[in-house]
């Protein structure tokens, strides 16, 4: 997935600003880092929020990144949708889901804000996987 994912993301970022990909990749790697594990989540990518430089340019950038993301997801699903999971792959998936839970509950700003400000816990925690494992 890494090649399929990083090249189009870099290309769509570079169309708007040659510094965006490097800047937002570093932000992604930092934001999605699990310090208690010494590891990052996922396979990389870009991350940004509160982008308020120039509304029209920012909108076009976000739109292009969204179109690229939709394309990438479609391609990955198309290539993988009929593959069978091995027992080992399922174990890895459950461990990755565990890392997702850890990140969301310990570090994600949106989750922390929602839970600390009296938000509806059911709605906030709805993204939690139904099954996860830890080692």
Language model feature labels by segment:
Residues 1-12:
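Short, small-residue-biased leader/transition segments that mark boundaries at the very start
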Residues 7-8, 70, 104:
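Residue-level recognition of well-ordered secondary-structure positions
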Residues 11-28, 35-37, 134-135:
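Intrinsically disordered, low-complexity terminal/linker regions enriched in Pro/Ser/Gly
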Residues 28-52, 98-100, 105:
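Aromatic/basic-lined ligand-recognition segments
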Residues 99-135:
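C-terminal structured interaction module
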């Amino acid at each position: 997935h890494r090649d399929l994912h990083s090249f189009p993301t870099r290309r769509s970022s570079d169309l708007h600003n040659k510094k965006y990909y490097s800047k937002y990749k570093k932000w992604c790697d930092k934001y999605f880092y699990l310090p208690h594990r010494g590891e990052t989540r996922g396979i990389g990518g870009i991350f940004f929020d509160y982008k308020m430089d120039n509304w029209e340019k920012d909108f076009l950038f976000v739109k292009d990144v969204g179109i690229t993301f939709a394309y990438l997801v479609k391609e990955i699903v198309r290539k993988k949708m009929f593959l069978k999971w091995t027992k080992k792959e399922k174990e890895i998936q459950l461990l990755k889901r565990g890392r997702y839970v850890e990140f969301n509950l310990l570090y994600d700003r949106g989750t922390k804000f929602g839970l600390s400000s009296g938000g509806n816990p059911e709605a906030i925690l709805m993204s939690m996987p139904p099954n996860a494992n830890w080692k």
